[in-house]
Amino acid sequence: MKLKIGCFQLALKKTDNFELIINKINNFLSKNSVDMIILSELAVGGPGAKNERFYLNNYIDKFSDIALKNNIWLIPGTFYEKLENKIFNVAPVINNSGQLVTKAYKMFPWLPYEENVEMGNQFCTFEYPGFGNIGIHICYDLWFPESSRQLSLSGSIAIVNPTLTPTKDRDIETIMVRATAAQQQLYYIDINSTGDQGNGLSIISDPCGEVIHKSADSEDIFIIEVCSDRVEEVRKEGTYKLGQPIKSFRDHPYFKNSYTMNSEYLDSLGKLKKPD
């Protein structure tokens, strides 16, 4: 199955971007048809974990209405959320019925700079009907390959990463995106902001590490297509019919108890052998 995704690298103010975002979404959907829209990290409110005005509870119903009205899945970037006096950086996933399917909690806040934010303690995936399992990273999570490995072993065939990077290490992150996609044999969708928030360079890589799209540092609203059959082909037959890292990792006895594995999915990839 092919999934058509609208990716929004927006020129954002430091904060208070809700009306701008809604106008951009409405204008885009008046001209285009997609299955899903993805925004960047903290797109609405920007950094500032103690600014309760931009907490998730103030916006979840508004974005749910947008998803329902337009019959799209929506990952509207991330928001801060307070739970039991702890603050987390959270990415909600809303389906085309306007329902909150799941929330991803940022595993690795950008410490020591992302202050007052707790570490998440659970990896997040969701099922897109007919397409398959999609994992969620939030920005700095990309820097920890263990998290990508866990998502791929859980059966994810794509990772979505809402990002807010304004710093000079952005070029390094674009390299990491390609490497992660190739190592985990999946699509990696990394959406940054620009303007007063991020410095752009959003990048999407296919399961062989090839770049599907890379933005410049200006606003860029673009559409990509990802294909579940392509991931299955690469994982079963190898990258360019060569290495099969997912199956090699699956079969290594040392790691059997180190990660939570979706055995049914991993077994469906077949034996580790040379392609016909």
Regions flagged by a language model, labelled:
Residues K13-S97, K103, P166-A182, L186-Y187:
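Cys-nucleophile CN-hydrolase/nitrilase-fold catalytic domain and related Cys-dependent amidase chemistry
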Residues K82-I157, T167-I175, E237-T239:
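Active-site catalytic loop in hydrolytic enzyme cores
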Residues K4, N32-S33, N133, G155:
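Short loop/turn motifs at secondary-structure junctions
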Residues L56-I75, W143-F222:
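CN hydrolase (nitrilase-like) catalytic-core segments centered on the catalytic cysteine
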Residues I37, G132-I138, V160-N161, I189:
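Short hydrophobic-aromatic micro-motifs
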